[in-house]
């Protein structure tokens, strides 16, 4: 059975985790995601902060930068994929790293999508809606 798109108005609340060390970039992502009705957003400054938040909550999607202090986004992807409780949560990499080998590496580690900065709200929304199987 193929999953069908769900109307945003008729689905249960969804929860996104935005992991970005730059407060300005994090706010741009939050602003873009705020256009998805009923999407609750939690923010994290880096991979370690994200893992703390993942330990106590359920998330439906994770958006993460790669280049962050303490724990980068690729290490976060590895850790999330190794955790049985979160291994199937879609992960979107949002980064300035635009080389094809960077994208391939992230996807090989388990990312579901790779979006390069500068952040374009329509592109972020398209990817999130596709991964969450929401109607546009």
Show where each model-derived region lies.
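C-terminal output helix
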Residues: 28, 119-129
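Conserved acidic carboxylate
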Residues: 20
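Charged docking surfaces used in two-component/phosphorelay signaling
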Residues: 27-35
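Receiver (REC) domain active-site loop signature in two-component systems and cognate sites
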Residues: 68
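Acidic, metal-coordinating helix/loop segments flanking the phosphotransfer/catalytic sites
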Residues: 43-61
